[in-house]
Swiss-Prot record:
This is Putative isoleucine--tRNA ligase. GO terms for biological process: translation. It catalyses: tRNA(Ile) + L-isoleucine + ATP = L-isoleucyl-tRNA(Ile) + AMP + diphosphate. One of its GO terms (molecular function) is ATP binding. The keyword Protein biosynthesis applies. Its EC number is 6.1.1.5.
């Protein structure tokens, strides 16, 4: 899943839709920091995920 865009992982999820982050395939320092300050169940938007992680992290999530 490395390099997969967030919007590629779940058909029907559009930028700005709420998603729940379950697991990160690859870690970056920024992502690791956010995991420490936010629980896994933190509700983010796909736009925010793209800003924070770009293409460096592939995320598995489920639509809320």
């Amino acid at each position: 899943l490395s390099g997969v865009r967030v919007t590629d992982l779940h058909a029907g999820v559009n930028p700005g839709d709420p998603v729940e982050v379950f697991y990160a395939v690859k870690y970056t320092p920024l992502f690791n920091y956010f995991l420490k300050v936010m629980p896994y169940s933190t509700v983010l938007t796909t736009s925010l995920i793209n800003i924070l992680y770009x293409d460096n992290v592939a995320l598995a999530f489920x639509x809320i």
